[in-house]
């Protein structure tokens, strides 16, 4: 009889454990607030709220907005990226084909973006508009580097050399004046 009671006690414990597992919230369905979601992804609360309103991020509101962590992770993976932008069905900035954005060209040439915009505006660098974005081919980047940036560096080098000569001459004159003053 004792064995039967122990067996039923063990069975009761197993039933309780199963019920707890069924009622337990899985780790993947943890929920966070807008503020917590913004901190997790280094964006503003407004950005999270806009994503919810645009139906890009699933969230529910009881007393406050709550976002499932899995949904937040899915949103992060599928979030808008200019690298994935398309224009008429083709990648806008297809680096494999040699097409780059103004920002990418600026970092390649180690110049400010504004200089690239100016170069395209005055015609020193040819770029084409695809939608609202400037797209620049790698051949144009190389041409601009060789034709304009190297000449600019040479001009700066010549002006620096002229400045050095001027300072050396000025220094020699000052030294002579100082010697005359002392003697």
From Swiss-Prot:
Pfam families: HTH_17 (PF12728). It comes from the Bacteria. Belongs to the EUO family. This is Uncharacterized protein CT_446. The lineage of its organism: Bacteria, Pseudomonadati, Chlamydiota, Chlamydiia, Chlamydiales.
């Amino acid at each position: 009889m004792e064995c039967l009671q122990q067996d039923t006690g063990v069975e009761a414990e197993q039933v309780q454990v199963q019920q707890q597992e069924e009622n337990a919230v899985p780790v993947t369905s943890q929920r966070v607030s807008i503020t917590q979601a913004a901190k997790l992804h280094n964006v503003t609360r407004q950005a999270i709220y806009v994503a919810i309103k645009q139906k890009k991020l699933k969230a529910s509101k009881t007393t406050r907005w709550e976002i499932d962590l899995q949904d937040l992770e899915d949103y992060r993976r599928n979030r808008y990226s200019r690298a994935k932008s398309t224009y008429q069905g083709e990648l806008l900035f297809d680096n494999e084909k040699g097409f780059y954005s103004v920002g990418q060209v600026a970092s390649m040439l180690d110049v400010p973006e504004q200089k690239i915009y100016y170069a395209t505006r005055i015609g020193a660098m040819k770029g084409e508009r695809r939608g609202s974005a400037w797209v620049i081919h790698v051949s144009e980047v190389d041409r601009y580097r060789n034709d304009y940036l190297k000449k600019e560096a040479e001009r700066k080098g010549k002006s620096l050399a002229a400045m050095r000569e001027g300072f050396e001459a000025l220094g020699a004159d000052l030294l002579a004046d100082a010697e005359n003053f002392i003697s």
